[in-house]
Amino acid sequence: SSAASDVYKRQQYACLRNLYYKEGYRVEMLSSFEPQFRFFYKWWIQLFAESEGKDNKGVFPVAGEFSEELHSVGQFIQDGSPIMFETFLDVKKQNASLIVEPDEKEDYFDYLDGKDFWEINKAAYHATVAAHSKKLPCLTIEVDELDAYHFGQLFYFFQFACYLSCKIMGVNPFDQPGVEAYKKWMFEALGK
């Protein structure tokens, strides 16, 4: 992708976050069917919560580790309060292959025998986007593949987009008055 296209995507994401916020969506769920994003979610939550959550403003960031949490969280998304929008991370290139091996157990999962987990997760991803987008706004950010280079691009994408989102919202992304308040109370309690 070109540099101009990348800048446009960051700007578009930041603008859409603010548009959804103004429309009353107060929660953003970052979701993926890729287990390698587990610790990335924690970084993303800290980035947006600490940068944007001030002056009684901000979109509350949460993450959905699918398919693990799809049943429980999916129920809320489909039938619960319409408080969130969802951003999916979709990986385009498969890194490894893991085939579901047949076993002797009689269960309802025999139809998956011989299928690759990549194929299963892609089917679940497409079905989830189709279902969730009927209820709430859904965005997709494509990641070419899971390697150091593309993770670096993803980190930069969200850092720049977070800065833009904060500026649009009218908050300073570089201070943390709420964190300083609890640290003051904690230090007093511990005698520092």
Residue ranges of each PLM-predicted region?
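Short, small-residue-biased leader/transition segments that mark boundaries at the very start
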Residues: 1-8
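A SIS-like phosphosugar-recognition module
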Residues: 9-192
